[in-house]
Regions:
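Extended alpha-helical interaction modules
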Residues: 92, 102-257
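N-terminal pre-transmembrane cytosolic regions of membrane proteins
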Residues: 1-140
Length: 261
């Protein structure tokens, strides 16, 4: 993967990259994905595990596996996958959050988002909640049907977002609305993808929703601080104007105290 952005021809036509650009872009492809044959139902949770919660969650997952005779994650593992009966669990630990992604059995002819996500999420109760939940996604992979256009009725029309893959092999939709059960619903219509490609797309869709939520986490605090910041900016402007007009030492000292208080 090139770290350069070319804007024309020649050796001097590349934009200077940020020193962390390659690392950030590589993160998207650093985690291996698993093949997902359609149809499939994926329930994805992201929890705030800052501080001591991260280590505690790892310890309880190890104990969870050991008590069931399953091979636990290694101490250095950041990604882990295990099978519980017919359910697949994928666990990922990041710097500030941890995800539990459950792929649960689904009937071939099951209607979209049926049965309910809450009834399928019972396996999440088998492990101790690692921290406050930030993200809960109900992603349903369905195979193309004759009445494909009917999916629009599953979502709020005022916020419905729909996209199609470049070759038309997949269509995905969401309205970003939280259901009464607390989930964001994403529908992925498979029009002939391989299980590997479906798995890759599932991971990217879950990443988009997870990081979209995390990116907005600081917004309430920004709103709370906005009046104080506006007041500080106003006072800074006033002091700057006084500095331009003042030649008195005592007055200058007073303004310095105001700036550094």
């Amino acid at each position: 993967m090139s770290n350069l952005v070319m804007v024309g021809g020649g050796n001097d036509s590349a934009l200077a990259p940020h020193p962390l650009r390659a690392t950030i872009l590589g993160e998207v492809h650093a985690r291996p994905f698993s093949a997902v044959p359609a149809p499939a139902r994926i329930l994805h949770f992201a929890f705030d595990t800052q501080g001591d919660r991260s280590a505690a969650d790892r310890e309880q997952l190890i104990a969870f596996c050991q008590t069931r005779g399953l091979v636990p994650p290694l101490p250095q593992d950041k990604h882990f996958r295990v099978t519980l009966g017919g359910t697949q669990l994928r666990w990922e630990q990041h710097s500030e959050f941890t995800t539990y992604t459950w792929e649960v059995p689904v009937e071939d002819k099951a209607s979209a988002f049926h049965p309910s996500a809450s009834s399928l999420a019972i396996p999440m109760r088998l492990v101790r909640q690692p921290g406050p939940v930030l993200v809960a996604v109900d992603l349903h992979v369905v195979q193309q049907s004759q009445n494909e256009s009917g999916f629009v009725n599953l979502f709020d029309q005022t916020s419905l977002a729909v996209a199609e893959s470049g070759d038309g092999a997949a269509l995905y939709a969401t309205d970003f609305k939280v259901t009464p059960e607390g989930f964001i619903r994403i529908l992925l219509i498979d029009r002939g993808m391989s299980p590997n490609r479906t798995g890759s797309m599932v991971q990217h869709l879950l990443d988009i929703e997870t990081y979209r939520t995390l990116a907005l986490l600081g917004l309430p605090e920004a709103h709370r601080l906005a009046p104080s910041i506006s007041l500080a900016e106003k006072r800074l402007g006033e002091v700057t104007q006084r500095m331009r007009r003042s030649d008195d030492l005592d007055d200058n000292n007073q303004m310095l105290n105001e700036l550094t208080a």
